[in-house]
A protein has these predicted regions:
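Short, acidic, metal-binding catalytic loop of nucleotide-sugar glycosyltransferases
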Residues: 15-24
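Glycine-rich, basic loop-to-helix element that forms the pyrophosphate-binding segment
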Residues: 55-72, 93
Length: 336
C-alpha cells in the first residue's frame, strides 16, 4: 500500500486487512512524505504483520507502490489503495483461487462502490471468463487495482512492476504486461468496497489518466493496426472507455471497424463457443450503448440506426424504449 495524506481514512483500510479470515499475511505500507499525520497513524499500529516504511522523499504513487511490492516477502502480492475496504474473505478467496489455478498470474475481484457511507453495486457485475476479460482490457481498464492479487515471482519479472511514466494508468499497463506472462481472471463476487470521493477526480488526474491509458492501448494495438494504432486507441478511449458521445457518422463507422478488427484478432479461431458468445453479447451491448449515448446527447439523430454496424450488434438486443426517450432528450438538447 502507498500512503499519502491518508490519515483520515487509512485506519479503516488497515482494519479491513486485520479483519481478514486469512490471517497469514504481511501488510507493507510506504508513506510518501505525507505532510499530515499519516505516518503517525501508521506507526500507531503495533501488529507485527504490519511493516511501515517512510520514504525519505516524495516520489509519487507509482514509485511508492513499487517500493512496497519489492519489500513484500510473500508469494502473492495484493494491491490496495489507502482508502478502499477489503471484505473479510478477500485474501482467503484469492489465495485459494491462485493455489487452484497455477496458470493464472493475476486474479482480481468484483467491487462495490462506497460513497459517503453508502454501498451501491459496482458497474462491472455479471459473469466473466479470462477470455472476456482479455476482450474488455482491449477496450478499457476492466479491473479495480485494489481488488488485484498476483504471483510475486511473475510480477517481479517486470522491471519495474508498474511504470511511473504511465501515471494514473499504471495498473492498466500492468495488466497487459503481466498478461503476456500468465492468465488474468476475476472472482465475480464483490470482495472490495471501492471508495468514491465527493466531487470526483480532478481535471489534472482525468486528463493524465486518459492520455496514459491511450498510450497503453496504442502499444497494445500496434501489432493489430500498425500506423492507425494511435488514432484508434484515441477513439476507443474517448468513446468506449470514457463514454463521450460520438458526433459524426464517420467516427461511428470507424469504431465499428475497430471492434470488428479486434474481434478477428482476439476471438476468431481462438476462443471456444461459450467465450465467443460472451464477447459477442458484450459487443452488442457496447454498440447500442454508443448509439444511445450519441442520440441522448443530441449529437446524432435516431437515423444512425441505419448505419452499418458490427454483425454482433443484434437488433434484438436494442431497447427501443431507451432509444425513444434518448431521441426526445436529444431533440431538446439540439434545440437548446
Amino acid at each position: 500500500m502507498a500512503a499519502y495524506k491518508g490519515a483520515a481514512l487509512v485506519g479503516e483500510t488497515i482494519d479491513s486487512v486485520l479483519s481478514q479470515t486469512l490471517q497469514d499475511f504481511e501488510l507493507v505500507i510506504v508513506d510518501d512524505c505525507s505532510p499530515d499525520n499519516t505516518l503517525e497513524v501508521l506507526r500507531g499500529y503495533t501488529d507485527p504483520r504490519i511493516t511501515v516504511i517512510a520514504s525519505p522523499v516524495n516520489q509519487g504513487p507509482v514509485k511508492t507502490r513499487n517500493i512496497a511490492m519489492n519489500a513484500a516477502r510473500g508469494r502473492y502480492l495484493a494491491g490496495l489503495d489507502q482508502d478502499d475496504i477489503c471484505l473479510p474473505e478477500r485474501l482467503e478467496r484469492q489465495v485459494g483461487f491462485l493455489d487452484a489455478h497455477p496458470d493464472v498470474a493475476l486474479v482480481a475481484a468484483a467491487a462495490d462502490f462506497l460513497e459517503e457511507g453508502l454501498i451501491r453495486p459496482g458497474n462491472a457485475r455479471g459473469p466473466t471468463t479470462p477470455a472476456l476479460l482479455q476482450w474488455r482490457l482491449h477496450l478499457h481498464n476492466a479491473l479495480v487495482w485494489s481488488s488485484v492479487m498476483m504471483r510475486a515471482d511473475v510480477a517481479r519479472q517486470l522491471d519495474p512492476i508498474t511504470r511511473p511514466e504511465m501515471l494514473f494508468a499504471e495498473d492498466f499497463d500492468l495488466y497487459h504486461r503481466i498478461g503476456k506472462l500468465g492468465g488474468i481472471a476475476r472472482i465475480d463476487e464483490p470482495l472490495l468496497h471501492y471508495r468514491i470521493h465527493p466531487g470526483g477526480v480532478s481535471k489534472t488526474y482525468q486528463s493524465t489518466m486518459i492520455a496514459n491509458a491511450t498510450r497503453v492501448l496504442a502499444e497494445v494495438y500496434q501489432p493489430i493496426f500498425g500506423t492507425d494504432a494511435d488514432e484508434n486507441a484515441r477513439l476507443v478511449m474517448l468513446h468506449v472507455a470514457e463514454g463521450r458521445p460520438v458526433s459524426d457518422r464517420k467516427t461511428f463507422s470507424r469504431i465499428g471497424e475497430i471492434i470488428t478488427a479486434l474481434r478477428g484478432y482476439l476471438v476468431e479461431g481462438k476462443y471456444d463457443q461459450a467465450d465467443t458468445v460472451l464477447v459477442d453479447r458484450a459487443i452488442s451491448a457496447l454498440w447500442w450503448r454508443l448509439v444511445r449515448t450519441a442520440i441522448r446527447a443530441g449529437k446524432m439523430s435516431p437515423r444512425i440506426l441505419a448505419l452499418d454496424r458490427p454483425k454482433e450488434a443484434r437488433l434484438a438486443d436494442l431497447k427501443w424504449g431507451d432509444i425513444l426517450v434518448s431521441g426526445m432528450i436529444g431533440t431538446v438538447r439540439r434545440i437548446a
